[in-house]
Amino acid sequence: MFAIGNLDERSEKIMRVTKECVELGLKAAKPWGHLGDIAHAINSHAQANGYSVVEEIGGHGIGLEFHEEPFVSYVTKKGTEMVLVPGMMFTIEPMINMGKDAIVLDKANGWTIRTADGAPSAQWEIMVLVTEDGHEVLAY
């Protein structure tokens, strides 16, 4: 993740906390665990720092197509969602907001997502492979 221009302390903090959320989610990515374990780690840390996690933006499976299943939510509970099986590849890429979790789609380009309340936001993405004894980061 990088910033454009000079950042104030609040912006530096949300970038740092977002990276920490991803790292905590990664620690929870274990074979025979659940996607919800990753969500719990991310959401708990974001909320503990006064931030919200966007429900509609999540990670995705990696395969032959762009954005394959499973959808990796960051607002589900520990011990829920799909079981993490060795060989699974997916992204961990939460969108963490300073304000509320609501977002809007830029209708001009049909791609850009903005916070509905105009508050700053940060996103960090990694690609993970679940292995027999843990995980491997494929892209950071």
Residue ranges of model-derived segments:
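Active-site neighborhoods and metal-handling regions in enzymes and metal-associated proteins
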Residues: 1-140
